[in-house]
Amino acid sequence: MENVSKPGSRQRSSLHYLFCGLFRRRSTLRGAGSFLAQCLPVFLSLLLLPALLGSCRRDAVPDADPADGQDPPVVVVDSVLTQIRVQADGRPVRRLDLFIYEADGLRALEKQYAFDELQEELNIPTLPGEKLVVGIANSPKRFNSKALERYDAMEQLSFNFADDDPAQPILGGFALTRREACEVQLQPLLCGIRLARVSNTMDGYELLENPRVRLRDLPNSAEILRLLEFRPAELIDAGAWTPLPYDVGFFSQDPGITLWCYPNDTPEDVLGVPRPYLEFECSIRGTNCSFEVPLPPLSRGCMKEVELTIDGPGSHSYNIR
C-alpha cells in the first residue's frame, strides 16, 4: 500500500523531534534545578494576576469630562464682618458668652463665642443677612450649645435667684443687627431694695431693739432675655435676715442695707399673684414686733428705696421711691 502523507505533516514531525531534542538536551545539561528556575516566573505571574486585574477596575468616582478640559467649579460661601458692641454700664464682667442666631426662618444658632472679660467691640465674620445677637455675662454654669441651637430655646433660658451674685450679677441682653452692626446692652435680673431710713416716733424714748430686715415671697427664677411681664411660677418663702447695725432710738438711722430679689412686675390690682414685701422685725419693751412693707411692681434690674417709720408696736408707715 502506498503511503500518502498530508501536506505539512512532515513539518510538524520535524518540529516535534526538534522540541524533544532540545528539551532532552537542556535536561541533560542543566538538570531538574534549571527546570524549576524556568517555571518560577510563571508561578509569580499567576500570583500577581488578581492584583493586576483589580488595578484595572474603574474608580467609583466618575471621571471629569475630558472634552471639558476645566476644573470643577469651587463653591464659595460669602461672609460679612458684623460689628457687635457690648455695654455693661460699668458692671463687672468675668465671663461673656455671645450667641449669634439667624434672624429669619428657624432662627438657628450660627456661632457661639466665650470670652474671659468684657469685649466692648467685636468684628465677627457671619453669613449675610440680619442676625439676633445674644450676650450673657457672669453665668454661673456652662451652656449646652445643643439645647440652645434655636433662638426659641434661648428665649426660655432661666437662671435661679440662688445662683446669682450681687457683686457679679448675671447680665443678659440681645439686639438685632442692622447693616451688619448692633449694640447689645447687658442688664441684670437682680432688683435692689434699699432700706434708706428707719425712724422711731414713739413717746417715752422706747428703743427698737435688735432690729433686722428681710424680703419675703421672692421669685425663684427669671428668664434672662425677658424684658416685661415677669410672672414667677415658683416663690421662695423668705430670704435671709440682715441685722441693722444699731438699735433705733430718738435719732433716725440710715442702715445702708440693700436686699436683692428677682423681678416681679405683676400690677398691684392683679389678685392671686403675690409680690415681694419687706419684713422689719424688732423688740419693743421686750415684745417681738413685725412690720410689713408691700413692694410695688419690680421691673428688671430696678432699684427701690424704702423709708420706714415705727409709731408703736402695732403702727407704722412707709414711703417707697
Name each region found by the language model:
Residues F19-L22, P41, R58, P263, ...:
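Residue-level detector of bioactive/disordered segments in secreted/extracellular proteins
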Residues P50-Q83, L195, G301, E307-G312, ...:
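Bacterial Sec-dependent N-terminal signal peptides
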Residues S34, C39, L53, P62, ...:
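Short stretches within intrinsically disordered, low-complexity N-terminal or propeptide regions
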Residues T82-R85, G90-L148, N200-C302, I320:
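Tryptophan-paired
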Residues A153-G192, A196-N200, E292-R321:
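Extracellular beta-sheet/turn segments enriched in Thr/Pro/Gly and aliphatic residues
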Residues K6, R285-N288, D311:
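Extracellular low-complexity Ser/Thr/Asn/Gly-rich intrinsically disordered segments
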Residues M1-G54:
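Sec-dependent bacterial lipoprotein signal peptides
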